Amino acid sequence: MKPISFEISYETSGGPRRISAGLGAPFETQDLSVCPHVDGSRITCSIETKAELTVTGFSLELAHEFGAKDRVLVNGYQSWTDTVELPVRSRMRGVNDIPGPVLRKWVLDGSGDYRFADYDGKPGHLHGYTYAYVRTDGACELVGSLDESDGFTKLEVLADEGKVIVRPEVPLGRLAAHETHTLVQLVLVRGSLDECFEAWFTHSGITARTTRPIVGYTSWYRHYYDIDEAKLTADLEAARDAFAQVETGDALKVFQIDDGYCTVGDWLAVNPRKFPRGLAPLGASAREAGFTPGLWIAPFVCEKDSRLFKEHPDWLLRDDDGNPVKTGCHWSGGYALDTRNGAFRSYLAEVLQTITRDWSFKLLKIDFLYAACMLPHDGCNRGQLMHDALELVRSAVPSEVLLLGCGVPLGSAFGVVDYCRIGCDVGLDWDGKLYMRGLDRERVSTKRSLANTIGRSPLDGRAFANDPDVFFLRDDVKLSAAQRALLLETDCTHASMLMTSDDMRCWDEQARLFYQHAVHALLDRSGANTTRKA
């Protein structure tokens, strides 16, 4: 890829303007100076304003001669978005072909980029965020953003035109005269796939907070919302007994309570029928059994039936027409919260501190994080909102608390969360019903989750420790023995977490041996295998 030119559009008191030029010396107008800088593999472009103005768009054009054998990967919008190597002439489908009533009822445009990104469906027109690469016969060229905290970086592959267009989010609002603002920071690297990712993260200065693998149990794929103290106590006992027979080395053993303990948004109002003693006793029991207690929370959303929705309408994120912004069809309807609202920020900090300090949960699975950046507002673009929201969570919890991000634009999570989901939810079957396969790119699918585990594996141990979602060894799912084996083998060789929702008491000796083999493979990859016998 070769940097060729830039284009910037802006508005002054004299009206809208647009200029384009090659990436040579600084380019000046009466309104601003554009300062591109190419230093080896690094490209930066900044502006210096001479008058008050609003930047409305910026793009950088890279030239690339695509070949018929090229494979292209563009990183999807968030954790669940499909991200795999594709033939260069592939088409990228959005939700344009879904009938409007279906789209609206199930809010199928809520979790992706469909509300603000174009999907033209043309062969070779692909887009993603933060990074992309082209690979042919082992040789790789990667373009990666060095900083997403000031805005997301969209990457558009136009194979038929021999171009890659870089479109960073621009500042929201008016810039004063004599301001300097960096619009984009990129790195272009070549080599093997591993060499490219290593060079990119070296340039960025980002390092993973941990490389310690996790093994353990989560309640979701066994009980879904139908959890209570008795069920989870039985699950904990089963997990304790099962792990007593497994060599886990230095892996962290986690027992995680997932969704279903309260109405979403009312995090401290734990359902007294399900958990008459609250959640703290279960967390204490998990610690006594040798596990790190974990808890699921979706910090930036609430459901329509919550007290929060009814009592704090001013905390809801609203569109230009004043309507609450829907994030999906989950629960009684999911709605985004305004993460810039001071009262909400105080409430969330209190919730997180109660969970981690008073209830003593030491791992938080923070989910549906994309809700924080549904709409640019309060002077912040989407990338700035996501960065700010994650920093709010990180600063509210004790330093030793581990964060597992999910449903998050990945670039914002680099170096911030300890563990991160890198694919969609697995299902209890292989690829869902036939009619589901034409829906959004974030849909539940074991097949697509597994593909994402491979596609995003280079991030593991560099950006964070990768969470591939759970595996299944139980036989009451609609997965063949070969599919279950492939899922577990892929997880232990491409990621850093081996979590299950199986009733581990029902595993036979063959299943236990298969799991032990997978744990050994996981530990060997991470260097955490301190117990394996020679």
State each model region's role.
Residues 2-251:
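Carbohydrate-recognition beta-sandwich/jelly-roll modules
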Residues 217, 221-353, 357-375:
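Aromatic-lined carbohydrate-binding/catalytic grooves of carbohydrate-active enzymes
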